[in-house]
Amino acid sequence: MNFGKAAIFGVVLFCLLWTEGAQAGLTFLSPADMQKIAERQSQNKLRHGNMNRRGVEDDLAGEEIGVTFPLDMKMTQEQFQKQRAAVQDFLYSSLLSLGSVQDTEDKNENPQSQ
């Protein structure tokens, strides 16, 4: 029984060490072979005319586009007061809708208390 536990432990340990070894060595090619593969891949990219993302990002990062335009609005004092009241009513009603239903009903029943 003791031998069986040791055997199982040994097999598990061997499997764990084997997977770490496989993860550590990505490829068994020599550096010269890896350079050949890299050259082939770069030639394929150039042949198809694809531009890598870094090259595109560098080109766009240098450009800065800015457009300015005036936002002038002319209105009378009366028009301004109407617009101001409309915006205040809109904001007040939207804020009330966020409140509880009972608070909203109380405000609607007694408009003079505001």
From Swiss-Prot:
Lipidation residue positions, type O-decanoyl threonine: T27
Q: Which residues form a coiled coil?
A: none
The answer, when asked if Phosphoprotein is one of the entry's keywords, is: no
Signal peptide annotation: 1-24
Q: What is its main location?
A: secreted
Which residue ranges run through the membrane? none
Q: Where in the cell is it found?
A: Secreted
Q: Which controlled-vocabulary keywords does the entry list? A: Cleavage on pair of basic residues, Hormone, Lipoprotein, Secreted, Signal
Which chain positions have O-octanoyl threonine-type lipid attachment?
T27
Propiece span(s): 55-114
User: Which is one GO molecular function term here?
Assistant: hormone activity
In which tissues has expression of this protein been reported?
High levels in stomach. Moderate levels in small intestine, pancreas and testis. Low levels in heart, lung and gall bladder.
PTM field = O-octanoylated by GOAT/MBOAT4. O-octanoylation or O-decanoylation is essential for activity. The O-decanoylated form ghrelin-27-C10 differs in the length of the carbon backbone of the carboxylic acid bound to Thr-27. 33% of frog ghrelin is O-decanoylated.
Q: What does this protein do?
A: Ligand for growth hormone secretagogue receptor type 1 (GHSR). Induces the release of growth hormone from the pituitary. Has an appetite-stimulating effect, induces adiposity and stimulates gastric acid secretion. Involved in growth regulation.
Q: Give the family per the record.
A: Belongs to the motilin family.
This protein's name:
Ghrelin
**Organism of provenance:** Aquarana catesbeiana
Task: Tell me the organism's taxonomic lineage.
Answer: Eukaryota, Metazoa, Chordata, Craniata, Vertebrata
